[in-house]
């Protein structure tokens, strides 16, 4: 199995220009930090969704929805896994990361891409088993996945939450990052010719600093967010062999960023700045980036609105979607609300990270319309004996959320969410004000479930792919007619 490392690169005039541009942009951003509180909020729905109705072939959970009780580990029931209207197609490896992407190339090969380093450098402890880097997996025969390559250029070595793919252009990209931030080495690969063997087009410092990412619909503007460094860098990808920074600006403690379908709005999951009580206090920021999108000289985004919700935890990512003619975000909070406590200890009263749906049809006036809350997230359950379940009290895991995915942006109908200790959860979102849970899949390790990766849909096969930190890559088929017609 080949690995793809970075060829020897000298500091050419182009590279020196990129470094200089990045330093200037970073200086401008740090000089314009915005220390403000979110401007508006609305009350959050507090009730849990009804349990999914599990059909034939399911292995349902044994109690509270979303929970794997300690008793199930002791009895061996947890080792059998839990499923509801899903069927395991295949699995691979024993380590997963934070994002999964899917691509079908011009020859009809189907590939999966996912990072295996977990939170770099933790992956080094698995060296020789999973190691580090980004896995390339041939999924043309989904029952028999084959890992064909490992990408080891700087960004792909540790992409953290930034791995992203543009299907029409056939480009796979990432910026180097970790749980805080790292120098923003930015890697671009061409996967269009043979997705099993990506071709490196460029590896440059264009990202300035890295952690998460976003991409315009036309695939010509990449956004690198840096989280704790308070910067977002827009990169021109018109020539993927020579990416060029356009602007760097202060976007709050920016986590995941996504764009509107025309590329003129930027939705930012903002962790917020520390307050007297909490380590994070953020929500959602919406920017007008039309000037950036149009490549106007000295383009800068314009902040349109900031928004939060009553039970904010750690804002992770806003996924845009359009349902019945209105614009929404499938917004995810990760982990749990972190009190300003040096131990970041478990507190049942703190909000659990979940997904929610926010109406952004008026980008200056966003409002939450529903929450994808499970029984396991309710405070009365968080305060009970479930906190003794393996992994449940982890400040960077437990019964909380991390990422969601949709099969398409216009009328997606369903969503798949990585709910960490609760595994993969499937929701019907055709009515954004009344979402329903319709399925799940969870095969936890002895230390607890750790489904962290943004899932991806294989619409041709009615499958969802995701990874678990401790149990590897999974391909799961939706069963019992929960796959919507016409999708």
Please state what every model-predicted region is.
Residues 22, 28, 41-487:
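Feature marking well-ordered beta-strand scaffolds used for ligand recognition
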Residues 1-5, 102-104:
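Short linear, low-complexity motifs centered on an aromatic residue
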Residues 3-39:
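Secretory targeting and sorting signals
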